[in-house]
Amino acid sequence: MRYAATILFVALTGCSGPQTDAKMQSLYENKKEYFSALVTGADCHIEKNKILWRHEVTKSNTACLELLAKVEADGIGVDPISEGIMVFPSSRNYSSHRKGYIFSAKALTPLYPSLDEHPAGLQPYQMGFKKIDEKWYITYEYAN
């Protein structure tokens, strides 16, 4: 019985879902220089329609991978819809709700005041956004 309780606890903590907006915004604000370096510096060479994952270590992407570690992210890539740069936070959960960061020169919609709960009217695989800084957004996607 004791083992069943432990397994249930581990299963539930693994399905806790993404971080809150407040935690994500705080991380962004505390590490803003590293987030900016990811998208504006010469260290990250991101191919369109491809994600650079932190475990893909080569000499040419070492500096970019160090920046990803500093912002607690697992990957970076170009979002094909907004053409912005998407930063994928490290997540150790199995939730159907995904959150991330996106840097976009274009204004992104739909905007929501909070992404802590599933936004009303947002369809599966459609992204919702919360603006946290000039050209920076938190993204939310429900992956049915």
Question: What do these predicted regions represent?
Answer:
Residues M1, D21, L122:
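Residue-level detector of functional hotspots within protein domains
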Residues M1-T13:
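Sec-dependent bacterial lipoprotein signal peptides
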Residues C15-G77:
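N-terminal export/targeting and maturation segments
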